[in-house]
Amino acid sequence: MYKLVLIRHGESTWNLENRFTGWVDVDLTETGADQARQAGKLLKDAGLGFDVAYTSVLKRAIRTLWHVQDEMDLMWIPVRNEWRLNERHYGALAGLNKAETAAKFGDEQVLVWRRSYDTPPPALEPTDPRASYDDPRYANVPRNEIPLTECLKDTVARVMPLWNESIAPDIQSGKRVVIAAHGNSIRALVKYLDQISDDDIVGLNIPNGTPLVYELDADLRPLRHYYLGDQDAIAASLAAVASQGKAR
């Protein structure tokens, strides 16, 4: 049996402000840093360890991983920073307040933009300063692969090559893997692992800073999965994530 741990980054500054973030590189709040440290403690107390870590190229996920590694005394393990694990690109919604956007366009439209499988938000213009073409962290990414908006289907399409070519082989070679990433890149992985339908994925939310442990068979099919931590607090966190895109 293999184990895989997925962790969404701790609360970010734009999570706190209820803004669409996507590829904008905002940092953790102090609450988010505390969540990440607590995640590391939970993993250590559960007797889990890691041989390799994966994260995105965005600091809120990177710093979350740092706190987890520090709490577990695993700062030395190799880390792969992969743009394919970035948050879904929210296009022209990046930086907008979710509740204000819902008040303008309606809760239903914002839910479609946030959670539907194949409907992207309005795209950025290529000349928009929020576009990532000139960002040095994507210097080796072909220009046509750098998005101006994404739906979850697009996020799955960029995450799965990394799973197939790197993450899955690492797991099957016996390495213990942790992935610190983002709500939608983790939703993409969970959709694949649990074979969630395109319709049902709309209802899946991922809480900040909470370790999600998968136990996998030899073919990397899930035997079970569970969150570490206080289950009532996790339920409250999931409810809070679900309500972010509603008009106040």
From Swiss-Prot:
User: For bias kind Basic and acidic residues, which ranges apply?
Assistant: 127-137
Q: Which GO terms describe its molecular function?
A: phosphoglycerate mutase activity
Pfam families, per database record = His_Phos_1
Instruction: From the UniProt record, give the pathway where this protein acts.
Output: Carbohydrate degradation; glycolysis; pyruvate from D-glyceraldehyde 3-phosphate: step 3/5
Give me the residues that bind substrate, please. 8-15, 21-22, 60, 87-90, 98, 114-115, 183-184
Active site (catalytic residues): H9, E87
Region named Disordered? 118-137
**Keywords tagged on the record:** Gluconeogenesis, Glycolysis, Isomerase
Provide the catalytic activity annotation: (2R)-2-phosphoglycerate = (2R)-3-phosphoglycerate
What is an annotated GO biological process for this record, any one?
Answer: glycolytic process
Q: Which NCBIfam families match?
A: pgm_1 (TIGR01258), PRK14115.1 (NF010713)
Q: Which PANTHER family does the protein's record reference? A: PHOSPHOGLYCERATE MUTASE
Family per similarity comment:
Belongs to the phosphoglycerate mutase family. BPG-dependent PGAM subfamily.
Q: How does it assemble?
A: Homodimer.
Protein role: Catalyzes the interconversion of 2-phosphoglycerate and 3-phosphoglycerate.
Instruction: List the protein's name.
Output: 2,3-bisphosphoglycerate-dependent phosphoglycerate mutase
Species name for this entry? Cupriavidus necator (strain ATCC 17699 / DSM 428 / KCTC 22496 / NCIMB 10442 / H16 / Stanier 337)
Provide the taxonomic classification.
Answer: Bacteria, Pseudomonadati, Pseudomonadota, Betaproteobacteria, Burkholderiales
